[in-house]
Amino acid sequence: FVTIGVPRKQIIISGHSCGGLLTLMLLSAHPEKVGGGISYMQACFGKLSSYYKVKKVGPEAALAKFAKKKPGPAELRERQINNIKKSNNVSVLAFTHPKDKWEGLLSDWLEEVPGVKRIVISQDYKINGKSCVVKGDNWQENISARKNPGHEMSQGLCFQYYNQTILEYIASRLK
């Protein structure tokens, strides 16, 4: 984009899941490359929240079990998060959901990152009191009936509730 004349501050990247974590990593390491980022349900290491029973045992015990069972990925995750936290200003709008099986209950570290604006989408599968559905050409399905509903909340029609927030974030980055 830059080579065709688009100013860097007008480039806003976004990513979902592992792409969401990569968005955070890029903006923390190279904030001058783009104008900002939007991260949805950032996670690259499997269904940590559900598999390691974070709700039952707590984040520390769950992450300790993850580190014992998969030391390489656990160390990589910790290193990536620590590198993101070291940045002076990570201009990212980050969406999380507590019922995301991947890292929904392990996302509080985002609160420690300067510049990140974290939005916890909801506590259930509704946004602003409305049930969430995903639609296709000739079908629709409640998000709560899907295999990974918390991880897919940003794909539901109810997520349009956040359109204004996203537009305001983008406008703030263009100034």
Over which residues does each language-model region extend?
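Extracytoplasmic/secreted envelope proteins and their assembly/folding machinery
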Residues: 23-24, 81, 163, 167
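C-terminal catalytic histidine-bearing segment of alpha/beta-hydrolase fold enzymes
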Residues: 116-175
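Conserved acidic catalytic loop of the alpha/beta-hydrolase fold
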Residues: 1-9
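Flexible, glycine-rich phosphate/dinucleotide-binding loops
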Residues: 20, 46, 101, 125-128
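The feature captures the conserved acid-bearing segment of alpha/beta-hydrolase catalytic domains
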Residues: 46-121
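Primarily recognizes the serine-hydrolase "nucleophile elbow" in alpha/beta-hydrolase
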Residues: 9-57
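Structured segments of extracytoplasmic/periplasmic soluble domains
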Residues: 3-4, 14, 25-29, 40, ...
